[in-house]
């Protein structure tokens, strides 16, 4: 099936203003297996953060758009849930193939609307998404959906209509991380991408369509969180809501879903610490921390934004971090030599700049590298300077709040116990790292992190392991079996027993009369 989507040249560099054509205009939403006109009166401008020029306009979706998408999903759900798992996974393998075929198109769109450097968009944004999608499908293919427990048959079945609300920072990866498990579980999905980055989602709708999923199983609607998102989350026919976003957005979604007692899964923010113990290889640990902290220009929930080092080695660590940052190139994301692109929007540029200014003026922190404003030579685009603060008070604003930019806060500590208090001393609990010359010591310390993920001496991400946070970093888990189970309900079917067995449960008689067990089963 061929679906009209963003033209392949949408990610090309902007022309000179005097000759620039009007940006593409899209007026439709993907509902019930086809593009249908939105009834939105207003529009959203999708902006290239590197040039500040418009890329396209899309509808500011309405509550009516959300309602139509949810009803299409609800109509498709029974048939999709009843489809055997082997058939669902076979169709979803076509989706994985479609992601691979369109990898360069996805990368171009992500570079254009997110500002991710082109080689990183292809290798990481898209490459990880393809790998994650494949892993999700194979997890479902090997999952045990039914098992006997004593005289009960325990069945795990699709939870219903799932609303998947995804962010702008690593949009394709975080979308497939939700949608593929939901679809593999047998749920019908309504996807709401961020209004900042909807263009890749149009291409994703095409990929699903070409895989021949039944109409209504996948729907995609674009709009703001306050209008379309709120209508989607609160819709009475939505059974499960899965959101990745800010902690503020998570609170709003929880409140909106409370009246319907919906299942809510939240992957939220983080103020993640990289803890370098006193026996660790400091240069290696600092280099790894800086590299991770700068990925996606610091716009990831997993970012190690706090670097904890022994007090007597802080100056050395700061110098190592400063030199490491100097080795990264900030600039045009379409240039293969670029490591750091712009922030995603003018609002993000203003927010990060304000944090940097506050960090330099309060709490006794020392600005060791970078600072507010654009890097030298860049006058257009939402570019910021990679920044290092030293002597950061763990209780200060920059020590506590998620900045979501390329800002590293170095915090000295005096002993292991103090270091762990600092690590665990925020409202977040998503990710962390610990570095030591002794793997056993590093693992022991990692067990004391109040976080959902900890990298021990550079251990890499594992898509089979649960992903999620403690405290205000979220509720629930994604990835692996846990990610699939987020979209499943569990049913226990008590099967008839041999005569004379003891009855346990809300019964008046100790044992059922002859034939009662068989009769109850026939009548039920």
Task: Name every feature range the model reports, one short phrase each.
Residues 2-50, 521:
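Hydrophobic face of amphipathic alpha-helices that form TPR/SEL1-like repeat modules
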Residues 54-61, 76-82, 164, 274-277, ...:
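Short, well-ordered beta-strand elements within core beta-sheets of diverse protein domains
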Residues 70-71, 89, 93-105, 116-142:
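Long amphipathic alpha-helix in the N-terminal Rossmann-like dinucleotide-binding domain
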Residues 100, 145-284, 413:
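Rossmann-like NAD(P) dinucleotide-binding subdomain of oxidoreductase/dehydrogenase enzymes
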Residues 51-57, 238, 275, 329, ...:
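Conserved C-terminal structural/oligomerization subdomain of aldehyde/semialdehyde dehydrogenase
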Residues 248-393, 456, 502-503, 508-513, ...:
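ALDH superfamily catalytic-core signature
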Residues 94, 149-152, 370-377:
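Short, solvent-exposed loop/turn elements at beta->coil junctions and helix N-caps
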Residues 33, 52, 88, 110, ...:
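Residue-level signal for inorganic ion chemistry
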